[in-house]
Design a protein with these regions (language model features):
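Glycine/Thr-rich beta-alpha phosphate-binding loop at enzyme active sites
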Residues: 64, 72-104, 108-111, 117, ...
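Alpha-helix-loop-beta-strand connector modules within alpha/beta enzyme cores
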Residues: 1-12, 50-59, 99-121, 157-162
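Generic structural signal for well-ordered alpha-helices
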Residues: 23, 45-48, 68-71, 100-107, ...
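Conserved, mostly hydrophobic/aromatic
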Residues: 26, 81, 106, 120, ...
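N-terminal active-site wall of soluble small-molecule enzyme domains
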Residues: 1-50
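Hydrophobic faces of well-ordered beta-strands that scaffold small-molecule active sites
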Residues: 10-14, 34-36, 58-62, 81-86, ...
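Glycine-rich phosphate-binding active-site loops on the catalytic face of alpha/beta enzymes
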Residues: 34-42, 82-93, 134-154
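Catalytic cores of alpha/beta
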Residues: 20-28, 66-77, 123-139
Length: 162
């Protein structure tokens, strides 16, 4: 159980084929949320219910080409929408500008529901403000932090502590 060594909330972003075969293992490992890709799941509602059966949060990941409207039928069952603002697979990619409109659409779909709106891909000091302004309340940043000389400073700036 990972909770024995970390108090940080953990989201397992399953960018894999057949995530249903791995949900139970991640739940047993002690993650707080499991996020699965919309595009990989024919039976998305069933998969979300499988995640929720472990009393953990469920998130849905949308790749750049996937429309926000596609998750409308399951919006009341999820705890997080993760907008991929790059094509998944490798770090260091440039932020896809059309993601801003997608974030705004997702924020509107969420309405007053208690759902996180996360964005992953190309998040750096040049993109974080516009992503937050569009409605995101959780940012995932890899390369901007890893490749920086002063990681703590970059993290603080991404958090808005300038």
């Amino acid at each position: 159980d990972i909770k024995k060594i970390s108090k940080v909330p953990l989201d397992a972003h399953l960018m894999i084929v057949n995530p249903q075969n791995h949900i139970d293992d991640f739940a047993k490992a002690g993650v707080d949320m499991i996020s699965v890709h919309f595009e990989n799941n024919i039976h998305l509602h069933k998969l979300i219910m499988q995640i929720k059966s472990h009393n953990i949060k469920a998130g849905v990941v949308l790749n750049p080409h996937t429309r926000v409207e596609n998750i409308e039928p399951i919006i009341d069952y999820i705890d997080n929408i993760l907008i991929m603002s790059v094509n998944p697979g490798f770090g260091g990619q440039k932020f896809i500008e059309s993601s801003i409109e997608k974030i705004k659409k997702a924020k509107k779909l969420i309405g007053d529901r208690n759902i996180f709106l996360s964005v992953d891909g190309g998040i750096n000091l040049n993109t974080c403000d516009k992503v937050i302004e569009a409605g995101a309340n959780f940012l995932v940043s890899g390369s901007a932090i890893i490749d920086s000389e002063d990681k703590k400073e970059v993290i603080n700036k991404l958090k808005g502590n300038k």
